[in-house]
From Swiss-Prot:
It is an enzyme of class 1 (oxidoreductase). Gene3D superfamilies: 3.40.50.970. The pyruvate dehydrogenase complex catalyzes the overall conversion of pyruvate to acetyl-CoA and CO(2). It contains multiple copies of three enzymatic components: pyruvate dehydrogenase (E1), dihydrolipoamide acetyltransferase (E2) and lipoamide dehydrogenase (E3). This is Pyruvate dehydrogenase E1 component subunit alpha. Heterodimer of an alpha and a beta chain.
Length: 358
């Protein structure tokens, strides 16, 4: 519990390295291996390059509407690094990089955002729930999973995240409160990218430090530079170890900047200036980690170029798999979700089959 705070209002973000990739504290011990750092950089670039391809495909009518992860790659991959493989993840609609870290294949994310139900059929071995669109519901899911882990005395945690705007939802407080009362194994996260669609944080909340919302529930919290991979990893590891130890839940606020649109149906140029975007890009998470890796000779130009080539091939292969995959039938949708159908579900299934047949 080295970096968690109980009641004092934090005034600064927890950071490990600056925009140039230099350690803020030269004596800070990096516990991640070079291979872990390079793998993290690979996944961050996979997420970003895939998002950029998807934006092009969507504009060309080859994909449906989706929510890019641009600007949140470090905090999401950092979250993954701080978890164990038997911990649970309850994603929201902007959790693609975290899901890639957990092992979910790129083609599965493409299937989801192209309206194919197979995109939600995630292999149970990844312990990652399907993408949740309903804002706030994932907090209840994570609280419930934390209850299960606590009840079974399993040394694992359930992790979820929500946007800054989502902290105004009732389920945000309700889930944290009940998890705190019963000391469930849950880590709640806020991905504060400073915009709820077009609404700025100052118009969403009377406090700019969203982590203080944990005080009402009596749980510890930490506010982290979400553009810093290592700080994000250390915060998640610290929080997860605290929660898995039977101490109850934790709240982490990751502070970042949403570089792209809320979704592809949104145009951010309407509500923010180019100058503002350029300022936000100065702390770009991918560039910051690149600076860190190059500065410490963990990665070089040739290795990076080889990495990018591999990523391009992986994305293209995923797209081709998505295109060739067939939509699931109504029977498959119901049979995948329910072991046994109630009379009401049987009726709904018949209505759905008739509707889609027509």
């Amino acid at each position: 519990m080295a970096i968690l705070i109980k009641n004092k209002v934090p005034t600064t973000l927890y950071q490990v390295y600056d925009n140039e990739g230099k350690l803020i504290d030269p004596n800070h011990k990096i516990t991640l291996t070079d291979e872990q750092l390079k793998h993290a950089y690979y996944l961050m670039n996979l997420s970003r390059m895939m998002d950029k391809k998807m934006l092009v495909w969507q504009r060309a009518g080859k994909m449906l509407n989706f929510a890019p992860n641009l600007g949140e790659e470090a905090l999401q991959v950092g979250m993954g690094l701080g978890l164990n493989e038997n911990d649970w993840v309850c994603p929201t609609f902007r959790s693609g990089a975290l899901m890639l870290y957990r092992g979910v294949k790129p083609e599965q994310l493409l299937l989801y955002w192209n309206g194919n139900e197979k995109g939600s059929q995630i292999d149970a071995k990844y312990k990652t729930l399907p993408i949740n669109i309903t804002i706030g519901a994932q907090y209840s899911h994570a609280a419930g999973l934390g209850y299960m882990l606590h009840y079974k005395k399993q040394p694992n945690v359930a992790v979820t995240m929500i946007g800054d705007g989502g902290t105004a939802e009732g389920e945000f407080y309700e889930a944290m409160n009940i998890a705190s009362i019963h000391k469930w194994n849950t880590v709640f996260c806020i991905n504060n990218n400073q915009f709820a669609i077009s609404t700025r944080t100052k118009l969403e909340s009377a406090v700019s430090d969203l982590s203080v919302k944990a005080i009402a529930c009596g749980i510890p919290r930490v506010r982290v530079d979400g553009n810093d991979l290592i700080a994000s990893y250390e915060a998640m590891q610290d929080a997860a170890n605290y929660a898995r130890g039977g101490n109850g839940p934790v709240l982490i606020e990751f502070f970042s900047y949403r570089q792209g649109p809320h979704t592809t149906s949104d145009d951010p140029s309407i509500y923010r200036t180019k100058q503002e975007e350029e300022e936000g890009m100065k702390s770009d998470p991918v560039k910051r980690l690149r600076n860190f890796l190059f500065d410490r000779s963990i990665l070089n130009q040739a290795q990076e170029e080889e990495m990018f080539s591999k990523i391009e091939q992986e994305i293209q292969a995923a797209y081709e798999k998505m295109v060739l995959d067939t939509p699931v039938s109504v029977d498959e949708v119901f049979d995948y979700n329910y072991q046994e159908l109630t009379p009401e579900l049987v009726e709904q299934k018949q209505i759905a089959k008739k509707y889609f047949k027509d």
